[in-house]
Amino acid sequence: KQEAKSDIMPLSMCVAMSQGYIGYDLQNALKEELLDRGLQQGVATVLTQVVVDGNDPAFQHPTKPIGAFMSKEEAEKMAREKGWHIAEDAGRGWRQVVASPKPLAVVELTTIRALAEADNVVIACGGGGIPVIATDHHHLKGAAAVIDKDLASELLAEHLDADMLIILTAVEKVAVNFNKPNQKWLDALTPEEARTYIGEGQFAPGSMLPKVEAAVKFAESKPGRTALITLLEKARDGIDGKTGTRIAC
């Protein structure tokens, strides 16, 4: 929950640092591209905190792998000496696992909205947002957690009243029976169809599953909203309806 003092940097601070250096590179790359196209448009990175519930069950059942891969012996040593929760990660080795609680509110929402409405490109909720717990007197305390970036992005899009949520990933479309002889790419999904596939275990946890869950939540949050999941390089074609998987009611 709230982070204990130790010789290891608090996880919330690690997320904040990640937001800073990723935002720095992304902001400059976007600005350069805009200028190359003759566009005088502002680009801003907002250090973003996301509120979670300190009583979220995720804190009792950490599942999010972070950090370096270790041997079983190394992992067990860290568990004994540092109190880490550890787990094997898809046969690739052992890693620390931390809580991944549900995002509840974006603290800097008003600032992000103001920047966007002033025609700025806004980079926000990096790494899922800095996890914080609201205490008495409106204080915010860093939490030992990593928030799912897809769910955090959905929450932000929903509260900004966006028409479309675009989730860019490493494949052009969502598939069922992925990497099997009977694999099938999906052009469109209703929330009901998506839930059926989720129930069948069609989408891998930590990979496509949170993307589909975020897309379903956004599509159902307000009539007329659509979510798109596609490949980064195919974003334009996806927006134009030429590729990608669309999730809508």
Question: What is each residue range found by the language model?
Answer:
Residues 1-249:
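C-terminal catalytic "cap/lid" subdomain
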